[in-house]
From Swiss-Prot:
Transmembrane segments: none annotated. Disulfide bonds join 62-70, 182-196, 272-315, 470-505. SMART domains: Aamy. It comes from Schwanniomyces occidentalis. Pfam families: A_amylase_dom_C, Alpha-amylase. The active site is at residues 238, 262. The record marks 329 as: Transition state stabilizer. GO terms for molecular function: alpha-amylase activity; calcium ion binding. Glycans are attached at residue 229. Residues 1-20 form the signal peptide. This is Alpha-amylase 2.
Length: 507
């Protein structure tokens, strides 16, 4: 690996006995307890305004095309924590919580939370500061974590960039805190990306001079206070690649928690270096080949397999990347395909891959909204069904992942071995030698079937269980495993010893 280790020689020797690819930790935040603790989390991302209302309504109108506040609140989230925890999630990621511009713009209202006006005030549409504290407290009572989305790149203005009234902002209330107005025109020019503005002249996004010490000092004091006041466990940073990289080291130190930066780029050579400045980044390099593989039955697994290898080579710590197949910026997977087998494979792959899994609210109900704003539906209109097949799948996959972590606290530090990658099937193996989980994914589709055999680290004749069907199998005498795929379903095999007395599949 290309980065330093904080493990002793003895520890390295021991780790090599139990894992084919032990993770080597960097000297800085990747090895800190704040970041390391997030490896074992499974995150449920939600849009606060669209998840749950205080009145508990399951019929309140919410037309996504109107781009208005629909009434979701912090209290609504609290009231539905059983629903989230029932899927096995251990953390939630909520929308930015600070005060937004109040205008009805050409793109609607700031219900999403990315159009800041005052970083010291809470968005009253979501509730009060006490409501947010209560949400944090209720999560921690359940041993769950709170991740809050934040924006450090820009504020917002209803209108042209040339007409911004900076005095309306708090605390950055002078033009001198912001870059001169210019829209981004060249995403291959990093200076243009960092110093010019996102947005347009309908809603302009005044770009902060985060490279200036006065701006960074204010943000550092603010984030330390935010984390302390609301007992926040992690932060997701919007538009991270648009902020000067020198801003992040002191900000990471001031925050003192896991930082997940949105680096909206599919090239690992561009995305991975951001781990030099913050704990983790959203895994867009994996997202694109994952989407292309699981959105239909025509693509082979070659591109996805190659990206897994590239991430291992280019990233400092793949176990701190945030993996996703849907989010608030991308069309939902069911907008590309209605094949439930493909969707289930994508969900299971996302949850079992190396890194921190993130599921976007509504995936468990099969929501199919395409681009923003259609992918920001009101979840209450689903009735919060717990009988949906996707809800049950997510629960089952999180359950085996959580069991693996319970049995071996180092499980999430191991890198997966690709046991098989050919045609339309990929098999991954992860964990210590005596507790390895083998996951088999495909894009054969609901009418597809195939039988594959590949080598594993299982002992000859070892009893294994597909935790998604509860069917028992045995490793072959030569330690290979024969897997029969029917109906294009994913398979996740665990040694019977791993799930003993867990309740999984009645063991």
């Amino acid at each position: 690996m290309k980065f330093a280790t904080i493990l002793s020689t003895t520890a390295l020797a021991l780790s090599s006995l139990v894992a084919s690819k032990p993770i080597f930790l960097s000297k800085r935040d990747a090895g800190s307890s704040a970041a390391a603790a997030w490896r074992s989390e499974s995150i449920y991302q939600l849009v606060t305004d669209r998840f749950a209302r205080t009145d508990g309504s399951t019929s309140a109108t919410c037309n996504t095309g109107d781009r208005v506040y629909c009434g979701g609140t912090f209290q609504g989230i609290i009231d539905k924590l059983d629903y989230i925890q029932g899927m096995g999630f251990t953390a939630i990621w909520i929308s930015p919580v600070v005060e937004q511009i109040p205008d009805d713009t050409g793109y609607g209202y700031a219900y999403h939370g990315y159009w800041m006006k005052d970083i010291y005030a809470i968005n009253s549409n979501f509730g009060t500061a006490d409501d947010l504290k209560n949400l944090s407290n209720e999560l921690h009572k359940r041993n769950m974590k709170l991740m809050v989305d934040i924006v450090t790149n820009h504020y917002a203005w209803n209108g042209a960039g040339s007409s911004v009234a900076y005095s309306n902002y708090n605390p950055f209330n002078q033009q001198s805190y912001f870059h001169d107005y210019c829209l981004i025109t060249n995403y291959d020019d990093q200076t243009n990306v960092e110093d010019c503005w996102e947005g347009d002249n309908t809603v302009s996004l005044p770009d902060l001079r985060t490279e200036d010490s006065d701006v960074s000092s204010i943000f550092n004091l603010w984030v330390a206070e935010l984390v302390s006041n609301y007992s926040i466990d992690g932060l997701r940073i919007d538009s991270a690649k648009h902020v000067d990289e020198s801003f992040y080291p002191s900000f990471q130190s001031a925050a003192g928690v896991y930082l997940l930066g949105e680096v909206y780029d599919g090239d690992p050579a561009y995305t991975c270096p951001y781990q030099n400045y913050m704990s983790g980044v959203t895994n867009y390099p994996l997202y694109y080949p994952m989407l292309r593989f699981f959105q239909g039955t025509s693509n082979s697994v070659d591109e996805l397999n190659a990206m897994i290898s590239s991430l291992e080579s280019d990233c400092k710590d793949i176990t701190l990347l945030g993996n996703f197949i849907e989010n608030h910026d991308q069309p939902r997977l069911p907008s590309y395909t209605s094949d439930s087998a493909l969707i289930k494979n994508a969900i299971a792959f996302n949850l079992m891959s190396d890194g921190i899994p993130i599921i976007y609210y509504g995936q468990e109900q099969g929501y199919s909204g395409s681009s923003d704003p259609n992918n920001r539906e009101a979840l209450w209109l689903s009735g919060y069904s717990t009988s949906n097949g996707y809800y049950k799948l997510i629960s089952s996959v999180n359950q085996i992942r959580n069991q693996a972590i319970y049995k071996d606290s180092k499980y999430t530090t191991y890198w997966s071995d690709v046991l098989y990658a050919s045609g339309h099937v990929i098999a991954l193996q992860r964990g210590a030698d005596d507790q390895r989980i083998v996951s088999v994914f495909n894009n054969l589709g609901s009418s597809g079937s195939q039988t594959v055999t590949f080598s594993t680290k299982y002992s000859g004749g070892e009893k294994v269980v597909d935790v998604l069907t509860c069917q028992t199998s045995y490793a072959n005498s030569d330690s290979t495993l024969t897997v029969s795929i029917s109906g294009g379903a994913p398979r996740i095999y665990a040694p019977a010893s791993l799930i003993a007395n867990s309740g999984i599949c009645n063991f």
